[in-house]
């Protein structure tokens, strides 16, 4: 309820009129209530849905409802603190709304470009009940109660190394390792023992070979070595190595075998890779004697042995390819070997297959251990199912016994 006001406290204003539904109302019994704080230009935050509601598509607040009877009253213009000329209520309200729209758009642009900063803007207008000015608080981005808002966390980019650039000579060049140039004439053809240093000049070319430059074992030797390993029922320390030249025909045949190997079970196949070679050197007898003595003394002496002999020439890679096949069981080792040995028979100088040994480090992945144990145990277990041949023999014996019983009964 409004407090009672004495008649002498009411001061009439001669230029004050109230218009309601296009009718002028007598102001003799009307009281105008105004907020002194809003007249002084201070910001007042409107609260509640009845006081303000954002308009669709813009950030301008609406103070009063147009259906309210007091919203259509004309009140006397209040003095502008900035000294601007007065305008009628309709023009001022329209200009205020348009200005607030433009300001809200500009504030949104600033917020989007500023990374979620909070912006406060106040709009003053003389329309509404008692000429009260309206103010609104615009905020964009995420605000936190504890302080300034933080932007999204940036994901760090991972550095992935390229396999093509992991050659030893490329790494040495990146480390600014100086390379010496051999004092020999560079030419094509076979290399003599006293001119072997010319093979290790600073160049990006590989050592090219039409045929493999080492002794190739026979197929019988490779198969015999594989059978000896399979008799132990454990082939986790054995593997197949394939070495072949870069001839197009040879590569096509090897790729066809690789496709068939990819369909087999219990195999670990490597991608074809190159070998890099360093400068050969003959150690003097003193170095050989110190190494032999350290090995005879035991592990501690061998660990303490420091015999590092270096060179300053550029390593060179050979152009023939290498591939390693690791099998889990003897079944898979012999199956892979049966696919690889025909390559040696077809290309006796360009393809070599051999069996190599490793320590008891296990398989490439632990998923093959179950298959290995099952193979070793399976040789000593009795078959649970009767073979089909035994079933046929048993059925024939039953039929013969039935026929004998019939003959005796007659």
Swiss-Prot record:
The record, for InterPro entries, names:
Herpes_IE2_3 (IPR005028)
A GO biological process this protein is involved in? symbiont-mediated perturbation of host cell cycle G1/S transition checkpoint
Q: Which Pfam families match?
A: Herpes_IE2_3
* ZnF unnamed span: 257-283
Q: Which domain of life is it from?
A: Viruses
Task: Extract the ranges annotated as region (Disordered).
Answer: 36-166
Protein name in UniProt? 45 kDa immediate-early protein 2
Q: Where is the composition biased (Low complexity)?
A: 47-67, 90-101, 132-147
One of the entry's Gene Ontology molecular-function terms is:
zinc ion binding
Alphabetical keyword list:
Activator, DNA-binding, Early protein, G0/G1 host cell cycle checkpoint dysregulation by virus, G1/S host cell cycle checkpoint dysregulation by virus, Host-virus interaction, Metal-binding, Modulation of host cell cycle by virus, Transcription, Transcription regulation, Zinc, Zinc-finger
Please describe what this protein does.
Activates the E1.7 promoter. This activation is augmented by the IE1 protein. It down-regulates the transcription of genes under the control of the major IE promoter.
């Amino acid at each position: 309820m409004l407090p009672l006001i004495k008649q002498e406290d009411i001061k009439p204003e001669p230029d004050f009129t109230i218009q309601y539904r296009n009718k002028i109302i007598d102001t003799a019994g009307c009281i105008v209530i105004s907020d002194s704080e809003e007249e002084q230009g201070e910001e007042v935050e409107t609260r509640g849905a009845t006081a303000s509601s954002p308009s669709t598509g813009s950030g301008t607040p609406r103070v009063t409802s147009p259906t309210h009877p007091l919203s259509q009253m004309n009140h006397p213009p209040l003095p502008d603190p900035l000294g601007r000329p007065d305008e009628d209520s309709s023009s001022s309200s329209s200009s205020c709304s348009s200005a607030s729209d433009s300001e809200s758009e500009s504030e949104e642009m600033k917020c989007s470009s500023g990374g979620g900063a909070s912006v406060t803007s106040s709009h003053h207008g003389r329309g509404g009940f008692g000429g009260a000015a309206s103010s609104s608080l615009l905020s964009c981005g995420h605000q936190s109660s504890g302080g300034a808002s933080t932007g999204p966390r940036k994901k760090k980019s991972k550095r992935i190394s390229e396999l093509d650039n992991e050659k030893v000579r490329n790494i040495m060049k990146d480390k600014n390792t100086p390379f010496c140039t051999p004092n020999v004439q560079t030419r094509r053809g076979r290399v003599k023992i006293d001119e072997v240093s010319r093979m290790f000049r600073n160049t990006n070319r590989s050592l090219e070979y039409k045929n493999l430059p080492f002794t190739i074992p026979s197929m019988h030797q490779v198969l015999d070595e594989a059978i000896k390993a399979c008799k132990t029922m454990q082939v986790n320390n054995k593997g197949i190595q394939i070495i072949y030249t870069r001839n197009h025909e040879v590569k096509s045949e090897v790729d066809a075998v690789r496709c068939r190997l990819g369909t087999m079970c219990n195999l670990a196949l490597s991608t074809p890779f190159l070998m890099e070679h360093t400068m050969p050197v003959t150690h003097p007898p003193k170095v050989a004697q110190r190494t032999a003595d350290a090995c005879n003394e035991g592990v501690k002496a061998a660990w303490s042995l420091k015999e590092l002999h270096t060179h300053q020439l550029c390593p060179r890679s050979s152009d023939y390819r290498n591939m390693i096949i690791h099998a889990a069981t003897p079944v898979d080792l012999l199956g892979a070997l049966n696919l690889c040995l025909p390559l040696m028979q077809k290309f006796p100088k360009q393809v070599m297959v051999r069996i190599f040994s490793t320590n008891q480090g296990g398989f490439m992945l632990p998923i093959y251990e179950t298959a290995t144990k099952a193979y070793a145990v399976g040789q000593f277990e009795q078959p649970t199912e009767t073979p089909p041949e035994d079933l046929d023999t048993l059925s024939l014996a039953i039929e013969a016994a039935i026929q004998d019983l019939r003959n005796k009964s007659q």
